[in-house]
């Protein structure tokens, strides 16, 4: 492998979600979710706070177990593909006492440094390999987290609002980077986001979760690269926003304060 041209990864994982349910105590968060996601598709999941979208992602990542239903990678249990799955959070979660390149190669054995440098080059940070995380901006830290996922050659990339804390310009740059790497490598992507404009700008498909159920499943059939501010993109964004903001029989409520998750793990 050369530092100039990263290898094309294996094809993305096809996902099947069948009658998926998740209950916490007496509260049912997900209610018989059914989804089929072809290999290599880019799916964005949107919805109000507390609707169950992050719970869905945690189930796919294996951080929680479903109360009922099935999660499949093709015809096999999704748990069999756990080594091919990586998860990115809103915070990069870099170890401050390790240099950038060591954060990328965390947990790896053997001669991993050339691959780590290659992953950093793919996200535009090869020249920062020997720096400490404290010297990086928020966007650069998320690029390192993305490189840390790429070095494992994932077939399924799960993104839990990884761009939520970034400024507007950096957010757009990261969206474009993720889109470019997805096109190059062909992995399957599930992005959880509150930003509807982000969802329609980069996803093949936008899924709206309403009260633990799939309320909208919209295919975004627009050519890439997509023109931000175009009439067609704005129309799709409006369609999704109108659905999010006007749930039948449910007036808008203040967003609840979400408790801290009880179980987290890095995308290592």
From Swiss-Prot:
It comes from the Bacteria. Belongs to the ABC transporter superfamily. Aliphatic sulfonates importer (TC 3.A.1.17.2) family. This is Aliphatic sulfonates import ATP-binding protein SsuB 2. One of its GO terms (cellular component) is plasma membrane. PANTHER family: ALIPHATIC SULFONATES IMPORT ATP-BINDING PROTEIN SSUB (PTHR42788:SF17), TAURINE IMPORT ATP-BINDING PROTEIN-RELATED (PTHR42788). The complex is composed of two ATP-binding proteins (SsuB), two transmembrane proteins (SsuC) and a solute-binding protein (SsuA). It comes from Pseudomonas fluorescens (strain ATCC BAA-477 / NRRL B-23932 / Pf-5). GO terms for molecular function: ATP binding; ATP hydrolysis activity. ATP binds at residues 47-54.
């Amino acid at each position: 492998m050369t530092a100039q041209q990263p290898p094309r990864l294996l094809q993305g994982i096809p996902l099947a979600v069948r009658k998926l349910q998740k209950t916490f105590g007496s509260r049912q968060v997900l209610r018989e979710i059914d989804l089929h996601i072809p290999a290599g598709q880019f799916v964005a999941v949107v919805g109000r706070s507390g609707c169950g979208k992050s719970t869905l992602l945690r189930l796919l990542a294996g951080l929680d177990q479903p109360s009922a239903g099935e999660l499949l990678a093709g015809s096999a249990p999704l748990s069999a593909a756990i080594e091919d799955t990586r998860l990115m959070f809103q915070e990069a979660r870099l170890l401050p006492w390790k240099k950038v390149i060591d954060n990328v190669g965390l947990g790896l054995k053997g001669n991993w440094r050339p691959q780590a440098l290659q992953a950093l080059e793919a996200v535009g940070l090869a020249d920062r390999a020997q720096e400490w995380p404290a010297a990086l901006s928020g966007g650069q830290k998320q690029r390192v987290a993305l490189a840390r996922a790429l070095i494992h050659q994932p077939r399924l990339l799960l993104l839990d609002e990884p761009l939520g804390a970034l400024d507007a310009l950096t957010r757009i740059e990261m969206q474009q980077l993720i889109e470019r790497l997805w096109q190059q490598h062909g992995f399957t992507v599930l992005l959880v986001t509150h930003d509807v404009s982000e969802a329609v700008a980069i996803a093949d498909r936008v899924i709206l979760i309403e009260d633990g159920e799939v309320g909208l499943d919209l295919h975004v059939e627009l050519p890439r690269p997509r023109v931000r501010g175009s009439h067609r993109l704005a129309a799709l964004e409006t369609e999704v926003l109108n659905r999010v903001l006007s749930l039948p029989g449910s007036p808008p409520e203040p967003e609840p304060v979400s408790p801290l998750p009880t179980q987290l793990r890095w995308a290592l």
